[in-house]
Amino acid sequence: MKSPAPYIDHTLLKADATSAQIRQLCLEAAHWQFASVCIPPRFVSEAVACLADSQVAVGTVVGFPLGYDTAAVKRAATAQAVAEGVDEIDMVIPLGAALEGRLDMVREDVIGVLDAAAGRLVKVIIECCYLENARKVELVELLAEAGADYVKTSTGFAVSGAAEADIRLLHQAAGGRIKVKAAGGVRDWETCRIMLKAGAHRVGTSNGVQIIQQWQEAPEL
């Protein structure tokens, strides 16, 4: 199998992340030519400067990790990130609204972020582990109609992360209209390979370097 590097969002979203760690993440991403880095909003400007001479996109999160922020706050956070040079946004839906079937509230959040993103790539986290399959499919339909670029499985901060079955379900429901990102618990090449084979177009992980090194040792897996 070819290198997974172009499919990896090299991620650092832990609470105690430092500028030095973000810089190291960016240097690793540039060296291995990952698709992007995914970092906390306050580090966007630093990452943009660090990656200015590379092809690596800079991504950040909005409404992360609980999705509690109002639509207006998510829109404003997105606009600020765009002003600082961000390329990609990973936003979290209002999960309670999704569970209650109040998809109008979910749509409002998503549309607001898409508008503020002004053409930047938008990935929408639906936190699959809390949802019934029928609701996951409904959300894929909503996101595809709204114009989101990706549906993303998880924040990595919930009770569980990406599952092969969810990737297959989302990929099938999307029907090529929207892409799928796997995130949460992808810590090794074998798991990454499973997610890509199941239909993921991106994989979010804080173990990108380890995954590439494992792939180099056993690329045939």
From Swiss-Prot:
Predominant place of localization: cytoplasm
Keywords, comma-separated and alphabetical: Cytoplasm, Lyase, Schiff base
Keyword hit for Coiled coil: no
A GO-annotated cellular component: cytoplasm
Pathway: Carbohydrate degradation; 2-deoxy-D-ribose 1-phosphate degradation; D-glyceraldehyde 3-phosphate and acetaldehyde from 2-deoxy-alpha-D-ribose 1-phosphate: step 2/2
Gene3D superfamilies: Aldolase class I (3.20.20.70)
Record-annotated active site: 90, 152, 181
Entry's EC annotation: 4.1.2.4
InterPro entries: Aldolase_TIM, DeoC, DeoC/FbaB/LacD_aldolase, DeoC_typeI
Catalytic activity: 2-deoxy-D-ribose 5-phosphate = D-glyceraldehyde 3-phosphate + acetaldehyde
Example of a GO MF term: deoxyribose-phosphate aldolase activity
UniProt-listed Pfam families: DeoC (PF01791)
GO aspect biological process, one term: 2-deoxyribose 1-phosphate catabolic process
Compartment(s): Cytoplasm
Record's keyword annotation contains Transmembrane helix: no
Protein family per UniProt: Belongs to the DeoC/FbaB aldolase family. DeoC type 1 subfamily.
Function: Catalyzes a reversible aldol reaction between acetaldehyde and D-glyceraldehyde 3-phosphate to generate 2-deoxy-D-ribose 5-phosphate.
Name of the protein in question: Deoxyribose-phosphate aldolase
Taxonomic lineage from the root: Bacteria, Pseudomonadati, Thermodesulfobacteriota, Desulfuromonadia, Desulfuromonadales
